[in-house]
């Protein structure tokens, strides 16, 4: 168990110290499993950095990409070029949302909402009574929405294919997850540390103490290639590094966290930059009606946004 203060101290270390720390964790993981390990590689900037660090220490560790069909086109292209192994899920995103429901507003809340709608009376009561483990007031309306809500797409489209790959090849995974990403990730790190050797699904998170700025700084100073949809990495007005285009490139059609996006949000930018995917997402997949229901805009308004983008 890692104390909160220790985690915070480690997150404040300079990048060079974090690189040394990460390599140490990779070596421990590799040696513990006799080299039977792999990198879960998404083509995004975090796993691109980790791939670079791993290849520096152990060039033989394969980078494995799960081709879900949900990546930004440039991320998918970059991942297919740089992965050593490509795997695929059994279902498409369309089949997942038809079977389980839409991913909104966050992984944890979607899980609570699904349980509030479909579990035993006791669990339903727990999810609706208020407090830490219940549906927040802001998202109560999703409990009675005319569509299903679920956190399961990540499990079906990513975790399941990777677990099958792990079983078939008898390899243990390394991921680029960072504690900084969410309170759920923070709790995971404090409970398990970087290398979780025990438990049902052993996993290594050697970049757990990194933060977004470290990733951008690493890319900038090492000049490694990365997916084009991030644009350039520049210093913003506040002295922080930033991407000139997308700064997060998870699954293109995912609604988790859209409520925290600035303006234009991910769907408004998608309309501008990826009109074909936008039409499929909003109309064919029905994401438009979900966003309408929760009052989140998804139409791009050029003049207003372009002024805002220029001042960004």
What are these regions (language model features)?
Residues 2-214:
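ATP-dependent adenylation/nucleotidyltransferase module used to activate substrates
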Residues 2-8, 212-312:
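ATP/NTP-dependent adenylation/nucleotidyl-transfer catalytic domains that generate, transfer
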